[in-house]
Amino acid sequence: MANFSLKAVKREDLGSGASRRLRRAGKIPAVIYGGDKEAVSIVLDHDKVLHSTEDKAFFSSEITLEIDGQEERVIIKALQRHPYKVKLVHADFMRV
């Protein structure tokens, strides 16, 4: 089983306008939910996530997200793609 790890930053600005600005800057808005903790909005680097999705194991493996120095073990639950561009739009992760 492959090990996947991605770096993320907590999101302060929420909403569609903020998400649009992130996408233009080469980032992906995402959310982590599940477990006994509150949902957390995060930002990921688009190119690193896109590169990880080229490996089919990414969708069924445990992923380690490093968020501001803390590690979260998650699995990917949803990944939204642009209808015709090779772009990711949003990701949902669930805590393991």
From Swiss-Prot:
InterPro entries: Rbsml_bL25/Gln-tRNA_synth_N, Ribosomal_bL25/Gln-tRNA_synth, Ribosomal_bL25_long, Ribosomal_bL25_short, Ribosomal_L25_dom, Ribosomal_uL5_bac-type. The keyword rRNA-binding applies. One of its GO terms (molecular function) is 5S rRNA binding. One of its GO terms (biological process) is translation. One of its GO terms (cellular component) is cytosolic large ribosomal subunit. Keywords: Ribonucleoprotein, Ribosomal protein, RNA-binding, rRNA-binding. This is one of the proteins that binds to the 5S RNA in the ribosome where it forms part of the central protuberance. Belongs to the bacterial ribosomal protein bL25 family. Part of the 50S ribosomal subunit; part of the 5S rRNA/L5/L18/L25 subcomplex. Contacts the 5S rRNA. Binds to the 5S rRNA independently of L5 and L18. This is Large ribosomal subunit protein bL25. It comes from Francisella philomiragia subsp. philomiragia (strain ATCC 25017 / CCUG 19701 / FSC 153 / O#319-036).
